[in-house]
């Protein structure tokens, strides 16, 4: 028997990690407070997700949110948790949530300098069947001197200060970036703390998996149809790509980050502007994927370069391993040239 203890006595928790990053940046501590408040909300949502069946949190709350999705009871709870925790961090001025039609302006006595865009419970249509769901967020600095308003949230993803997502799967995981790579943390239920499990994650240059909803194949444009066909029937005689699609974006994006490959939710005849929302779905995951060395595009430009015009704006999203995304873009350019 060695003398190695099964207990780590100098573990890097996410709380400690956030404080260290703040100290290195010689910041005011506001971003540290904000991230720690976000983590508290994520822990609370994780607990609610685990207890959902017992606590009668499954099912529909009886309303439809601003983007047309039926609101689940867990959606309502998660949204309230995130809003309350962020506003009580004394570091936010504007909040944009998938569940709220208009931006939420923090009251003057609790106001700080950050804007947060978030989806409190992504993939909530999967709640009742116990598939993985998640929370997504992106943090920006307020850039104007005016009174806080919705306009403060209409910033391109290049302005993101920090972004991440939580995945409530077989364990609860947080992927976080403050602009210096992507780190992964796992929730240790015994400690009630997120612990660093992987530092500076890098996506593979090329993967072996493609992920999209092929039920919409009837509506695909020529470029998407051609690309998917190439993955199924490779012209060079190589093995076809595997197909994986959960239907919960956080789960599909995280698998793409870990295993490589490509995730596609392109524009189609049914959703000509795309389906996923730019501010609180596409920008945060595009930021994470780019920080890990991948690419994220709308098919015409990098996602992070899109200048938002509305807080619930939708855009196409294609992301993943750089060589796979580049191959998709080659199909797009070829089809545009052939018109």
UniProtKB/Swiss-Prot annotation:
Residues reported to bind substrate: 122, 213-216, 245-249, 265, 275
Activity regulation remarks: Subject to complex allosteric regulation. The enzyme can assume an active R-state, or an inactive T-state. Intermediate conformations may exist. AMP acts as an allosteric inhibitor. Fructose 2,6-bisphosphate acts as a competitive inhibitor. Strongly inhibited by Ca(2+).
One Pfam family hit: FBPase
Pathway: Carbohydrate biosynthesis; gluconeogenesis
Key words, A-Z: Calcium, Carbohydrate metabolism, Cell junction, Cytoplasm, Gluconeogenesis, Hydrolase, Magnesium, Metal-binding, Nucleus, Phosphoprotein
Modified sites of kind Phosphotyrosine: 216, 219
Motif interval(s): Nuclear localization signal: 204-208
Cofactor(s) in the UniProt record: Mg(2+)
Residues involved in AMP binding: 18, 28-32, 113-114, 141
The protein's enzyme class: hydrolase
Binding residue positions for Mg(2+) 1: 69, 98
GO biological process: fructose 1,6-bisphosphate metabolic process; fructose 6-phosphate metabolic process; fructose metabolic process; gluconeogenesis
Compartment annotation: Cell junction; Cytoplasm; Nucleus; Cytoplasm, Myofibril, Sarcomere, Z line
GO terms, molecular function: fructose 1,6-bisphosphate 1-phosphatase activity; metal ion binding
UniProt cross-references to PANTHER family, sorted A to Z: FRUCTOSE-1,6-BISPHOSPHATASE ISOZYME 2, FRUCTOSE-1,6-BISPHOSPHATASE-RELATED
Record-stated family: Belongs to the FBPase class 1 family.
Protein name as it appears in the record: Fructose-1,6-bisphosphatase isozyme 2
């Amino acid at each position: 028997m060695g003398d190695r203890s099964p207990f780590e006595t100098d573990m890097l928790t996410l709380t400690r990690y956030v404080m260290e990053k703040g100290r290195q940046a010689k910041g005011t501590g506001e971003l540290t407070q904000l991230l720690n408040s976000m983590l508290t909300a994520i822990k609370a949502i994780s607990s609610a997700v685990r207890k959902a069946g017992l606590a009668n949190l499954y099912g529909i709350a009886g309303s439809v949110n601003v983007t047309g999705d039926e609101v689940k009871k867990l959606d309502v709870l998660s949204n309230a948790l995130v809003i309350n925790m962020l506003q009580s961090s004394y570091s936010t001025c504007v909040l944009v949530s998938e569940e709220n039609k208009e931006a939420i302006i923090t009251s003057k006595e609790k106001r700080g300098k950050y804007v947060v865009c978030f989806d409190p419970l992504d993939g909530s249509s999967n709640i009742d069947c116990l598939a993985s769901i998640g929370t997504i967020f992106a943090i920006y600095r307020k850039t104007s001197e005016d009174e806080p308003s919705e306009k403060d949230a209409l910033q391109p993803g290049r302005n993101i200060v920090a972004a991440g997502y939580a995945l409530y799967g077989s364990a609860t995981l947080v992927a976080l970036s403050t602009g210096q790579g992507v780190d992964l943390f796992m929730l240790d239920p015994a400690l009630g703390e997120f612990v660093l499990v992987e530092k500076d994650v890098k996506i593979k240059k090329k993967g072996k998996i493609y992920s999209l909803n092929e039920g919409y194949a009837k509506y695909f444009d020529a470029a998407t149809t051609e690309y998917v066909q190439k993955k199924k029937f490779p012209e060079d005689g190589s093995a076809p790509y595997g197909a994986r699609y959960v239907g919960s974006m956080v789960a599909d994006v995280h698998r793409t980050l870990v295993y490589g490959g490509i995730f596609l939710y392109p524009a189609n005849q049914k959703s000509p502007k795309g389906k996923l929302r730019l501010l609180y779905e596409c920008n945060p995951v595009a930021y994470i994927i780019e920080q890990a060395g991948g690419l994220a595009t709308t098919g015409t430009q990098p996602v992070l370069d899109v200048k938002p015009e509305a807080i619930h704006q939708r855009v196409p999203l294609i992301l993943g391993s750089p060589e796979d995304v580049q191959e998709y873009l080659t199909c797009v350019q070829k089809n545009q040239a052939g018109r």
